[in-house]
Amino acid sequence: MKNKIKIRLKSFDHRSLDQATKEIVSAVKRTFANINGPIPLPKKIERFTVNRSPHVHKKSREQFEIRKHKRLLVIGDPNPAVVDALSKVDLAAGVDVVIELESGE
């Protein structure tokens, strides 16, 4: 029976995301666990177009975009020390973390 922990990190800022992945990888490597990653996932770009003027000049528009960067870390066959190390890691405020436990039978 093989267990895996999948950690998905999402952020608007790629620098804070890379810093968070480095902190998690170093914390897991201190416990001598097997880790794969960080695997960069495709970034999602959302574009919005709005009128510059509320009344006339319909052709005058402005475009904005939001870039969502994502990374994936996979920890193979974790032990309780890994879970303890992950709970002690302090990450930046702009990084969203989703942790999934996957058990293979």
From Swiss-Prot:
Record-level GO cellular component terms: ribonucleoprotein complex; ribosome
Keywords noted in UniProt: Ribonucleoprotein, Ribosomal protein
GO BP term, pick one: translation
InterPro entries xrefs: Ribosomal_uS10, Ribosomal_uS10_dom, Ribosomal_uS10_dom_sf
A Pfam family annotated for this UniProt entry: Ribosomal_S10
Gene3D superfamilies: Ribosomal protein S10 domain (3.30.70.600)
NCBIfam families listed in its UniProt record: PRK00596.1 (NF001861), rpsJ_bact (TIGR01049)
Function according to Swiss-Prot or TrEMBL: Involved in the binding of tRNA to the ribosomes.
Subunit structure: Part of the 30S ribosomal subunit.
Similarity remark: Belongs to the universal ribosomal protein uS10 family.
HAMAP family: Ribosomal_uS10
Protein name, as recorded: Small ribosomal subunit protein uS10
Lineage of source species: Bacteria, Pseudomonadati, Pseudomonadota, Alphaproteobacteria, Rickettsiales
